[in-house]
Each structure stands twice: as structure tokens, then as C-alpha cells.
């Protein structure tokens, strides 16, 4: 297996077969629009070159998905070696189904799909549409070579007029280059509260997001607050989260400062993971049923992390 991306370790680059620095500069310039903390999804992250550098340069959480063992094992090592305490790694091969399901429950500020859509089965333009639905901003790099993998996808990719051409990335195939595009859109509603929630449980929350602020409000209560960068802990588990490790998350739960008032509903789906940090949400929700005291509930979440079964 080739070293596709370069490795980035504490400010130094070890070159892989793909040029990365120039492509990162395109991404970095685009990300400068954010005047707030933001969340990145890096689909097919490989060695996490772009995400690791984004976390160095900006106040962001980056969620990196990779399915190849050589790559995700090295990815987790690199995230740790660079001290990226806002890094999240999935061991997951994205499909159209998993992209669609992810968009039902999560919202990302910046989605990176760098030379990846031709590796995903199915109609490539449907794949692009599903990736667009994941957040406000999407950057995509498109393969075009006759000897690239996934020729059916390569030859049928259509980039619409609503995409902005940002530049080109030098390919690893012969002397060709690949076009890099960006697209912006706004989404305010979710289809589900969390993965696996009971059918008929209405999401009931609204997102207001721009480059300067991001807030969440609720249909059934008066609370409105800043969006917490990261993803739901249930999403992390469902998509094969391997970094931070379970041991690290258990330690975070044990050391977590107790809420000022009893929460009453500490469950996996009421926790947001922002890398090494975990944040409780939905305290004092008038619609929830108090299940047990908070200390026992935290023990229940710790057991769930290792077993995948919620029994508190």
C-alpha cells in the first residue's frame, strides 16, 4: 500500500506520492472565512494531512474517516503525535447510505472530499449531492484521468454551475492535475435527533449558521445556545470511532465536572464529543424522563462505550 498523502509531524512534512502543501493552501485560504470555532468532516482522510494542519491553524474540531487499516492506524498515530486534542477518527468506509444517515443527525461547517467521490459506489453525482447535504461548505477534488480508479464514476462526474473553481491539485498520475471546487449552502433542520432514536421522535431543533456564528434553538423549550463543535457521541460510536480511545473517553467522563444542577438525563445521545472533550447537552429538558442520578448515569455511559448496550 502506497503512502498516498504526505505525513505532517509537528511542522515538518514527510512527502507521500500526492502533493499536499499546495492543496492545503487552497483549503486554508477558504477556511479563513470562519470567525468562530468550526467542525470539519474529512472523508477518506488517509494520513489526515489537511485536517491536522487545519487544527494547527484554526480553532476547529476535525472528524476524519478512513477505512484502510494501514491508513487509519497511521492516522491515529499522527493525530496523537501532533497533539491534536480536537481530532476525531472513524474507522469507516463511507457509502451513499452512511453519508445519507450522517446528514440526518449531524451538521458540519466544512466538508473535505479530496479525490474520494470516485471511490464510493453508486451514481457519483448522487454521492456529490449527499456530501453537499452534510454541511454549509464543501470542498471537492475531482479525478479526471483515464487511468484513475473508478472509471465509471470518473467519466460521469458533473460539476454544476453552483460550484466555485478554487484551483488545481497536482495529481500522482503522470503529469495531470485535478480540479478543486467549493460550494456553499445553508441547512437549518435535522431529520432525526440521533442515530437509533425512536421512530416518531421529532428532531425539534433549528440551526442558524453563518461564518461568524452558529446557534441552536428548540421547538419545545426556550433554550437557545451556541453550537458546540464536534459530533454526538452516538454518531462517534456508530461510525466506528477509534480516536479518542475508549480509555481516554472513560477518563474524561470520570473527571468531568458535575453539572451545577442535576442533569437527570445523562445518556450517550446527550453528550457531544469534541476530540478529547465531552460536553453535556439537554439538561433540564421538559420532555425527558429522569432516569437515575447523574453519577450512575455516567457509569452507564462508560459501560455503553465498551459494550454498545445502554442499560442505565
Region roles according to the model:
Residues 119-130:
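A short, conserved alpha-helix within the catalytic core of class I
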Residues 216-247:
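Conserved structural core of kinase catalytic domains
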Residues 112:
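A conserved beta-strand element that flanks and buttresses the S-adenosyl-L-methionine
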Residues 275-312:
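C-lobe/activation-segment region of protein kinase-like
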Residues 135-146:
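Conserved beta-strand signature within the Rossmann-like core of class I S-adenosyl-L-methionine
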Amino acid at each position: 500500500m502506497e503512502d498516498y498523502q504526505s505525513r505532517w509531524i509537528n511542522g515538518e512534512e514527510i512527502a507521500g506520492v500526492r502533493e499536499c502543501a499546495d492543496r492545503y493552501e487552497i483549503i486554508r485560504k477558504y477556511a479563513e472565512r470562519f470567525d468562530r470555532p468550526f467542525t470539519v468532516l474529512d472523508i477518506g482522510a488517509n494520513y489526515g494531512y489537511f485536517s491536522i494542519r487545519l487544527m494547527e491553524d484554526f480553532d476547529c474540531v476535525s472528524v476524519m474517516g478512513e477505512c484502510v487499516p494501514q491508513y487509519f492506524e497511521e492516522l491515529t498515530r499522527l493525530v496523537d503525535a501532533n497533539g491534536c486534542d480536537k481530532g476525531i477518527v472513524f474507522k469507516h468506509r463511507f457509502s451513499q447510505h452512511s453519508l445519507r444517515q450522517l446528514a440526518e443527525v449531524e451538521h458540519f461547517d466544512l466538508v473535505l472530499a479530496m479525490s474520494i467521490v470516485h471511490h464510493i459506489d453508486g451514481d457519483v453525482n448522487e454521492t456529490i449531492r449527499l456530501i453537499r447535504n452534510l454541511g454549509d461548505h464543501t470542498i471537492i477534488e475531482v479525478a479526471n484521468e483515464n487511468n484513475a480508479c473508478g472509471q465509471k464514476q470518473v467519466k460521469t462526474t458533473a460539476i454544476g454551475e453552483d460550484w466555485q473553481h478554487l484551483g488545481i491539485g497536482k495529481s500522482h498520475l503522470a503529469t495531470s492535475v485535478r480540479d478543486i471546487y467549493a460550494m456553499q449552502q445553508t441547512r437549518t433542520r435535522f431529520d432525526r435527533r440521533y442515530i437509533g432514536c425512536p421512530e416518531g421522535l421529532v428532531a425539534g431543533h433549528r440551526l442558524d449558521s453563518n461564518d461568524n456564528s452558529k446557534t441552536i434553538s428548540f421547538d419545545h423549550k426556550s433554550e437557545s445556545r451556541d453550537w458546540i463543535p464536534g459530533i454526538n457521541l452516538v454518531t462517534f460510536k456508530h461510525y466506528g470511532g477509534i480516536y479518542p480511545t475508549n480509555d481516554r473517553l472513560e477518563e474524561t467522563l470520570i473527571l468531568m465536572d458535575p453539572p451545577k444542577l442535576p442533569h437527570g438525563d445523562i445518556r450517550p445521545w446527550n453528550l457531544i464529543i469534541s476530540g478529547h472533550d465531552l460536553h453535556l447537552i439537554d439538561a433540564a429538558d421538559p420532555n425527558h424522563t429522569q432516569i437515575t442520578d447523574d453519577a450512575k448515569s455516567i457509569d452507564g455511559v462508560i459501560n455503553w462505550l465498551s459494550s454498545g448496550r445502554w442499560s442505565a
